[in-house]
């Protein structure tokens, strides 16, 4: 069986979200009339959290490679492309370790 095209899902997404918001709005009005606002506020905050996480997930799906490309540049350097490979050896630190430690009085 043919798999659904990803674009079809994205085209149906706004209608689904608007339908869910419409349903939530009518439920909000019913609960407003019954004065049960704690449940409504909880549902609104939960919906906000879910929509925010969904938005972050979708944005990462679209722009994740671009963001990763900004931080990781393959090349001669080490991690993130800015540190040379031989920089893990710090001879100045080794020489400083051999010196006697100075106190604040000296």
UniProtKB/Swiss-Prot annotation:
- GO terms for CC? membrane
Membrane topology listed for this record: Multi-pass membrane protein
Function summary: May be required for cellular fusion during osteoclastogenesis.
What gene is this protein a product of? Tcta
Q: State a single Pfam family of this protein.
A: T_cell_tran_alt
Q: Where is this protein found?
A: Membrane
Q: List the InterPro entries hit by this protein, alphabetically.
A: TCTA (IPR016560)
**Any coiled-coil ranges, and where?**
none
Query: Which residue intervals are topologically Extracellular?
Result: 2-8, 65-106
Q: What organism does the record attribute this protein to? A: Rattus norvegicus
**Parts of the chain on the Cytoplasmic side:** 30-43
**Carbohydrate attachment residues:** 80
Query: Where in the sequence is N-acetylalanine found?
Result: 2
Grouped into one coarse class, the protein's main location is membrane
Q: Which UniProt keywords apply?
A: Acetylation, Glycoprotein, Membrane, Transmembrane, Transmembrane helix
Do the record's keywords include Transmembrane? yes
Transmembrane portions of the chain = 9-29, 44-64
Q: Name one GO biological process term.
A: osteoclast fusion
Q: What is the lineage of its organism?
A: Eukaryota, Metazoa, Chordata, Craniata, Vertebrata
| Protein family | Belongs to the TCTA family.
| Presence of keyword Cell membrane | no
Query: What is this protein's name?
Result: T-cell leukemia translocation-altered gene protein homolog
